[in-house]
Amino acid sequence: MKPLLAKDLAAFMQRFNNFKDGEFRSLEVISPTIMKIILAGQDETRAFDWISLELEFNGVSDARLLDSAKLHLVNMSEGINLIYDRNFAFAVGEYNNLSNIKDSACYIVCRDLKYKESRF
């Protein structure tokens, strides 16, 4: 897994078009402070081919999670958002700050973020 740094977030999200119209494939709670999700989306650097992307959240301090059986029902038309404001924050939907992210149906706030690309 590669670390995702705060300075690289904007380019990372642009590369995958915020996972708009992508797929929320899985969510796994490894421990109370470590969580993983798998998303599928189109990669701008690969001529918009579909890939899977695993995100690992370490040092989780707050979260609202969905039941894994309901992930296929998540509306991904707005994609996801990743921001950094002293901590990383992930949310399904268009949110631009930490307080708004907590309005999302699914969000995770953590200290460190890593990712791994794989085949669709």
Report each predicted region and the residues it spans.
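Surface-exposed, interaction-prone regions used to assemble/regulate multi-protein complexes
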Residues: 1-120
